[in-house]
């Protein structure tokens, strides 16, 4: 895993390179496809822990305040080399007007190929934020094709639970999203599975888009003239010349 850069310069980030402490290195190779994922949600729901767990398999309980870092990792899924870039984002509050004016959040959502919305089962306010974030992401991607996944984190803290898992599943179904309940601290496999399925979906979309562009770029060949028609027209022209010569 590599920390690429702070989110404040995300719009300047080139797809095939990264910047780490002033040095440049490749974030993808010529044979790697770039997949960009934005992870969003309320404060303290475990967004950074989720990202680091997926990219490194390690769980770190304490983090500094989220500055909105962009991470990269090379993986292979179904035989395809992927350069996965994951944009961690600072926590947001329940206020649609604040979402619209949150430039950091907007940059991340516009940049992303897919969105992961994280909430904590121990925080009902973070659950209430899901619909706002989902609507905002759809507005920034009016084509409605961007995949959005909802992740319920801290599944191990049952004694602090404020949100029932079935409520998260019901909301995800209503919004047309995939739902995962995970414990970032205790289960890496669930975290990996959520991102793996998402990456497969993005890759499939990219393949479909490439095929459509290739299909649309094919210029249809003009129809070949009918040889019988050409012979008929040639005979007509020849007969006309013969009649003209005879009359003279």
Curated annotation (Swiss-Prot):
Annotated GO MF terms: G protein activity; GTP binding
Q: What Enzyme Commission number does this protein have?
A: 3.6.5.2
> Is-annotated flag, keyword GTP-binding?
yes
**CDD domains (alphabetical):** RERG_RasL11_like
**Alphabetized UniProt keyword annotations:** GTP-binding, Hydrolase, Nucleotide-binding
- Catalysed reaction per UniProt? GTP + H2O = GDP + phosphate + H(+)
Name the Gene3D superfamilies for this protein: P-loop containing nucleotide triphosphate hydrolases
What SMART domains does the record tag this protein with?
A: RAB, RAS, RHO
Region of interest (Small GTPase-like), residue spans = 30-248
Q: Which domain of life is it from?
A: Eukaryota
Where is the segment annotated Disordered? 206-228
Q: Which residues bind GTP?
A: 41-48, 88-99, 153-156
Pfam families annotated for this entry?
Answer: Ras
Q: Which InterPro entries match?
A: P-loop_NTPase (IPR027417), Ras-related_GTPase (IPR051065), Small_GTP-bd (IPR005225), Small_GTPase (IPR001806)
Its EC top class is hydrolase
Q: Which NCBIfam families does the UniProt entry name for this protein?
A: small_GTP
Cited PANTHER family: RAS-LIKE FAMILY MEMBER 11
State the similarity comment: Belongs to the small GTPase superfamily. Ras family.
User: Protein name, please?
Assistant: Ras-like protein family member 11B
Which organism is this protein's natural source?
Xenopus laevis
Q: Which gene is transcribed and translated to give this protein?
A: rasl11b
């Amino acid at each position: 895993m590599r920390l690429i850069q702070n989110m404040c310069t995300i719009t300047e980030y080139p797809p095939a390179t990264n910047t780490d402490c002033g040095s440049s290195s490749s974030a993808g190779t010529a044979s790697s496809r770039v997949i960009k994922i934005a992870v969003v949600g309320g404060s303290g729901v475990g967004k950074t822990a989720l990202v680091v767990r997926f990219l490194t398999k390690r769980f770190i309980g304490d983090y500094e305040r989220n500055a909105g870092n962009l991470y990269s990792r090379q993986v292979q899924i179904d035989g395809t080399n992927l350069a996965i870039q994951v944009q961690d984002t600072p926590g947001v509050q329940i206020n649609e007007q604040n979402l619209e004016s949150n430039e950091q959040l907007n940059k991340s959502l516009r940049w992303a190929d897919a969105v992961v919305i994280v909430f904590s089962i121990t925080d009902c306010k973070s659950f209430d934020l899901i619909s706002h974030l989902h609507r905002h992401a759809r507005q920034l991607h009016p084509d409605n094709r961007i995949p959005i996944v909802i992740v319920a984190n801290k599944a191990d803290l049952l004694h602090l639970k404020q949100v029932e898992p079935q409520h998260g599943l019901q909301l995800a179904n209503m919004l047309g999203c995939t739902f995962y309940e995970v414990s970032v601290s205790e289960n890496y496999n669930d975290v990996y599975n959520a991102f793996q399925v998402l990456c497969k979906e993005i890759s499939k979309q990219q393949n479909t888009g490439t095929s459509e562009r290739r299909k649309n770029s094919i210029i249809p060949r003009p129809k070949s003239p009918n040889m019988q028609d050409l012979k008929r027209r040639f005979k007509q022209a020849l007969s006309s010349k013969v009649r003209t010569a005879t009359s003279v």
